[in-house]
Amino acid sequence: MDSYLLMWGLLTFIMVPGCQAELCDDDPPEIPHATFKAMAYKEGTMLNCECKRGFRRIKSGSLYMLCTGNSSHSSWDNQCQCTSSATRNTTKQVTPQPEEQKERKTTEMQSPMQPVDQASLPGHCREPPPWENEATERIYHFVVGQMVYYQCVQGYRALHRGPAESVCKMTHGKTRWTQPQLICTGEMETSQFPGEEKPQASPEGRPESETSCLVTTTDFQIQTEMAATMETSIFTTEYQVAVAGCVFLLISVLLLSGLTWQRRQRKSRRTI
């Protein structure tokens, strides 16, 4: 029964003349290790009146809170009230059917963030005040034009490549959320930034790839030394061969000179 009443409220709100709010069909996109939060809520946003375990809405209580107002002031209509449940099974979920309307959920950020003071803009409501025995998680139904901001959870660091925000837009008659440009990585993974010195690791604690690089470098040095030694030995051998050739040539010249001198001596004797 409560689900049908909520659906009737949604349809009535959308069909009332002058109300141009269009509900977003999907949830804001999810980013690993990040949460999103709205700094302010556009007029037409609805918040389910959910109670924590062991409590339920009072029978005459509102099913949801609605952000309404005019050009100068916006506020939340209705009030959520919870009372103790008589039995465990009397608590009812105040959410529309999945095929009719999906739930909009937000999670508290790890630290406050105020990128834009949207609450001061016309047509926006601030965060609704808490009510007694409220559920731990709030379920919103966002409208077109709503903006949510993303932040990395504790233990992760943001690597911005663009705006860390998402906006619900209407495109070709269908609603869609823009994709936030945010990447969250572990602090250990992003500790090394340009300009930071990387700690020196001992050879024993180095990975196998680094050890193989060291072995390869050592082998290369050994091969270089061997090549240099071989070149030196080759050069020495060539030098020895050249010296031997010069000595052989000198001896040959001396022998030829001796033979020539002997022939001249013989000719001179015959002439006498």
Swiss-Prot record:
- Which GO CC terms are listed, alphabetically? external side of plasma membrane; interleukin-2 receptor complex; plasma membrane
- Where is this chain compositionally biased, Basic and acidic residues type? 195-209
Principal location class: membrane
Q: Which organism is it from?
A: Homo sapiens (Human)
What SUPFAM superfamilies does the record point to? Complement control module/SCR domain
The record's InterPro entries line, in alphabetical order, gives: IL-2_rcpt_alpha (IPR015486), Sushi/SCR/CCP_sf (IPR035976), Sushi_SCR_CCP_dom (IPR000436)
- Which disease does its entry mention? Type 1 diabetes mellitus 10: A multifactorial disorder of glucose homeostasis that is characterized by susceptibility to ketoacidosis in the absence of insulin therapy. Clinical features are polydipsia, polyphagia and polyuria which result from hyperglycemia-induced osmotic diuresis and secondary thirst. These derangements result in long-term complications that affect the eyes, kidneys, nerves, and blood vessels.
What is the residue range of the signal peptide feature? 1-21
Please list the residue ranges that the record marks as compositionally biased, kind Polar residues.
87-98
Task: From the Swiss-Prot or TrEMBL record, give the protein name.
Answer: Interleukin-2 receptor subunit alpha
Q: Where, if anywhere, are coiled coils annotated? A: none
For this protein, the record's Pfam families field holds: Sushi
- How is it placed in the membrane, per its record? Single-pass type I membrane protein
Q: Which residues are glycosylated?
A: 70, 89, 218, 224, 229, 237
The upper taxonomy is: Eukaryota, Metazoa, Chordata, Craniata, Vertebrata
Q: Name one GO biological process term.
A: regulation of CD4-positive, alpha-beta T cell proliferation
Q: Where are the transmembrane segments?
A: 241-259
Q: Which residues lie on this side of the membrane: Extracellular?
A: 22-240
The lineage's top-level taxon is: Eukaryota
